[in-house]
A protein has these predicted regions:
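Bacterial N-terminal signal peptides that target proteins for export
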Residues: 4-18
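Bacterial N-terminal signal peptides
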Residues: 17-28
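Terminal, non-catalytic domain-edge segments
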Residues: 33-53, 118, 157-164, 178-181, ...
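Extended ligand-binding groove/face enriched in aromatic
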Residues: 58-250, 262-266, 279-307, 351-406, ...
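Extended amphipathic alpha-helical interaction segments
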Residues: 205, 272-274
Length: 534
């Protein structure tokens, strides 16, 4: 539930738009020339060496976290992890699995299929009995994981989702969706029946957790409620935070189009309809991050007030257009213009938002007043979050401002509205019928500006990894925070005093980065596949 970072954005894989364009792109670049044999051999050798390091030296029972020090003495997912832990949340274990399948598609080398199989073993072990996944799993067992939550997790001031162990699974941050999509892709590769039970459990988890109106909670199944600072437990609320509904619809569409499971059509359509019923009425036709069970906007974490969220509204408008292109039903377009008008009307005056940002993140229900988030104190024990109308000194780790491209939203709507339903649904798996369309060839490829195949080959070190900036560090756990506020100012920082285990930016720390691995492998895959645009 963190604010979208570049790592997290890039870890988000195929969206509904990709499903719609997969057929159109399937022949793209078919006339491109393959690289010379010698160059191709160099690329493939580099890929193999890097992946061998990953599978033989870095993986723990097939799973991965996000970042490692070169000597493996410390490692991190969204928080510092232990040696026996693997991270499910992207760009973690399942994301690496997607990359291995992509490499298999590019090279035909069964080594990468076997690497993907190792990842699947870790994910199947980590799968909750109900069928979903938590952010993290620990091969040392649940007792060890609970102890981690009660120490490292509990003291991450800004990471409230890690301060308590619920013992269930989460849709947050696409961990469940990423894992489920990977198992689907791996099963479809050779139809190996050993993956089908876990895949079926994941599908059933998405179906079982869906509310009758079509929305999904953040966590499932429901367990004993946990209160943070006196607030109700938000994890059962229907949520749009971090694209939960969009990810689940995407997964179900992928299953519908490949497995021939006709029963999935109804939950897909109900999931889409949930966007209609949760859109607020005039004069504030936007969406909240989450809702009560009677569909009223509600607070979640202590820095997510009851409000309408501008970035969520913009994302949901994009999805409404995609739903029209999937179904041809104009009801999904009916209220798009008024929501765009509303977003335009609440743009901040010049000079209020930082450069590149246009809107406040949170808008007060009933007033259109921007709500700006602040904090005081120095750790999870003595600190608190609050909001007011002051745009100065807002949080560093969760921006009070968002970039909303009104012009792009209007064009997206206009282009869709100009299409007839028949034109809009060309290539839609919901129109073509279940079990008809293939999935895209690649899922995990990331952009890598300025990186070439030659530079990627040259920069792989003798150990077999790309040394890269890790981007952040954290205080090792030393004990619970004090009730006394430490000297200093922590209102705009990513981390509090030395008891705060939340990661913080660090431009000096280098090591082994999953993101760097995926970016470099993406460059190399593009170099050997002539169907990829250059």
């Amino acid at each position: 539930m963190k604010e979208e970072t570049m790592i997290h954005q890039n870890a988000r894989r195929i969206r509904l738009a990709a499903v719609l364009t997969a057929l159109a792109l399937s022949g793209a670049g078919a006339m491109a020339q393959a690289p010379p044999r010698e160059a191709r051999d160099d690329v493939m050798a580099t890929m193999k060496r890097a992946a061998t390091f990953m599978t033989e030296k870095l993986a723990y029972k097939g799973g991965y976290v996000w970042n490692y020090l070169p000597d493996l003495s410390r490692r991190w997912g969204e928080m510092e992890a232990r040696e026996t832990m693997i991270w499910i949340q992207p760009p973690g274990t399942a994301t690496v699995g997607h990359l291995y399948l992509d490499a298999y598609h590019a090279t035909g080398d069964n080594f990468y299929y076997q690497a993907a199989d190792q990842v699947a073993g870790a994910l199947i072990w980590a799968q909750h009995p109900a069928g979903g996944w938590n952010y993290v799993a620990d091969f040392a067992g649940e007792r060890s994981l609970k102890e981690w939550y009660e120490t490292v997790g509990k003291n991450g001031w800004r990471l409230e989702e890690f301060q308590h162990y619920w013992g269930n699974a989460t849709f947050d941050d696409a961990g469940t969706a990423e894992s489920a999509k990977f198992l689907l892709r791996l099963y479809l590769e050779k139809r190996d029946p050993k993956y089908r039970p876990s895949l079926d459990k994941a599908i059933q988890f998405v179906l079982d957790s869906q509310y009758p109106i079509g929305a999904w909670p953040q966590r499932y199944p429901r367990v004993a409620e946990h209160s943070t600072r006196g607030l109700p437990d938000y994890t059962a609320y229907p949520t749009f935070n971090d694209d939960v509904a969009g990810e689940n619809i995407d997964f179900l569409v992928m299953c519908y189009q490949t497995l021939g499971d006709a029963r999935l059509l109804d939950p897909i359509l109900r999931g889409m309809n949930a966007f209609i019923v949760t859109q607020q009425g005039p004069p504030q036709p936007g969406w909240s991050l989450q809702y009560t069970l009677d569909l009223k906007p509600v607070q979640a974490r202590t820095y997510e007030p009851r409000s309408l969220a501008t970035h969520t509204t913009a994302r949901n408008l994009e999805l409404m257009v995609q739903f029209y292109r999937l179904t041809g039903d104009t009801k999904f377009l009916a209220r798009v213009p008024e929501a765009i008008d509303w977003l335009e009307s609440i743009a901040l005056p010049p000079g209020v938002a930082p450069a590149g940002r246009t809107h406040a993140t949170f808008i007060e229900v009933g007033t259109n007043r921007p709500l700006y988030i602040h904090r005081e104190g120095s750790n999870v024990v003595n600190g608190r979050y609050y909001w007011d109308s002051n745009p100065k000194d807002t949080l560093g780790h969760y921006s009070s401002f968002r970039p909303i491209n009104i012009v792009a939203l209007r064009k997206l709507y206009a282009d869709a509205r100009a299409m007839t339903p028949e034109q809009a649904t060309k290539g839609s798996p919901l129109v073509a019928g279940h079990g008809v369309l293939p999935l895209p060839k690649y899922f995990a490829l990331m952009p890598a500006p300025g990186v070439t195949a030659a530079s990627s080959i040259a920069s792989l070190n003798k150990e077999g990894y790309w040394l890269a900036p890790l981007g952040y560090n954290s205080h090792p756990y030393k004990g619970d925070g004090s009730t006394n506020v430490a000297p200093g100012s922590y209102g705009t920082t990513h981390v509090g005093d030395e008891s705060d285990t939340s990661p913080y930016p660090d431009k000096t720390l280098t090591g082994i980065s999953i993101e760097a691995f995926i970016r470099n492998m993406s460059v190399l895959i593009r170099a050997i596949d002539p169907s990829m645009s250059k």
